[in-house]
Curated annotation (Swiss-Prot):
Phylogenetic placement of the source organism: Eukaryota, Metazoa, Chordata, Craniata, Vertebrata
Function: Dual specificity phosphatase able to dephosphorylate phosphotyrosine, phosphoserine and phosphothreonine residues within the same substrate, with a preference for phosphotyrosine as a substrate. Involved in the modulation of AMPK and MAPK1/2 signaling pathways.
Family recorded in the similarity comment: Belongs to the protein-tyrosine phosphatase family. Non-receptor class dual specificity subfamily.
Subcellular location(s) of the protein: Cytoplasm; Nucleus
EC number assigned by the record: 3.1.3.16, 3.1.3.48
Organism whose genome encodes this protein: Danio rerio
Protein name: Dual specificity phosphatase 29
Amino acid sequence: MSSAQAEDEQDYETPSCYELQKHFTHGGVAYTHVNEVWPGVYIGNEETARDRYKLQTLGITHILNAAEGEWNSVDTGAEYYKDMQIHYYGVTAEDTPTFNISQYFYSAAEYIQQTLSDPHNKLLLHCVMGRSRSATLFLAFLMLQQRMSLLQAVEQLAHRRHICPNWGFLKQLRELDTHLQEERRRTHT
């Protein structure tokens, strides 16, 4: 790491929820059912998750359902994909500001990282709309596995998909960002 990068990291401050939301609404891409947001990673909505032909066309080998459960969910499950040779992982997350989605940050990031360890794999990360829960988990992946700041992760994703994590999720991402920045500063001093 160059000294300029180290200095930038030391000067970095986690942006407010309001500042982050500006990145979602200014100059972003139009909403579509699915977008490739990283090599081998697609974020999509329920329609994409249920479209078996589309999944085959995209070459999807793994699915992370960020909306498993009974309320405001996508109830596909592993059984839905059993004849497609798709590895399924689901998390029960509600798209409400009070839901603790941070409990899934590390496990989801690890699942994404393991999936991408084989360059032939392709992952669909989805929720109902593909804008809040799935986007939040992918932002956490970028922060944890790719060592991006929250701002870098938001900029990376917002240029590729129309996202809108709820305020509670943004607060949890901000907490993760603060924790990771403090950890990185400790290791650089």
